[in-house]
Regions:
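Conserved N-terminal beta1-alpha1 strand-loop-helix module at the mouth
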Residues: 1-179
């Protein structure tokens, strides 16, 4: 909580944590700890809960315990369907959904399902987080890998859903990603 408060005091507007009852990723917090952090930054910060879980009942239970403002779905995109995301939204009407869109590193756009994912998840997503997926990985992001930034542009131009770009960004390449 102390670190999260420090971020808010320095001007941060969003606090995100990976959380859940079943530990799936390094650094993942349990629901109780996530709730403590989220309560510690209210009402100053938007609270983002990241999950790689794919079972909506498990996700719902975790949501009830931690109560983020935004749910960042970062697991295998084919593991939770748009209909299941819609069900989550009906269970938690105030919840915003940030759907991770996987862009395969080193793979041309026409050989990926990216644009189909955008079309399929657009009706149930409040934000897209465009991130690099290692070709052999199940989850999306946290690889340090970059991808073709022209794909980011294609996605942004194809949707009205606000997009956040990610994927190996650092001081040497963030300007290129923005332009």
């Amino acid at each position: 909580v102390e670190d999260a408060r420090m971020v808010i005091d320095m001007g941060g507007e969003h606090i995100g944590v990976s959380y859940g009852k079943i530990k799936r990723t390094p650094g993942q917090l349990d629901c109780e700890r996530a709730r403590e952090i989220f309560e510690g930054v209210q009402p100053q910060a938007v609270r983002i809960g990241l999950t790689v879980a794919e079972d909506i009942d498990e996700i719902s239970e975790n949501l009830r315990e931690a109560m983020p403002d935004v749910l960042h779905l970062s697991g295998d995109i084919e593991g939770i369907s748009p209909a299941e995301v819609a069900e989550l939204k009906s269970r938690f009407p105030e919840l915003k959904i940030m759907q991770a869109i996987p862009v395969l590193a080193g793979v041309p756009l026409d050989e990926q399902k990216v644009m189909q994912y955008v079309k399929d998840y657009e009706p149930v997503s409040d934000f897209f987080l465009i991130d690099t997926k290692a070709p052999a990985a199940g989850d999306i992001g946290a690889t340090g890998l970059t991808h073709d930034r022209a794909i980011d542009r294609a996605i942004i131009e194809a949707t009205d859903v606000p997009c956040i770009i990610a994927g190996g960004l650092d001081a040497s390449n963030v300007a290129e990603a923005i332009y």
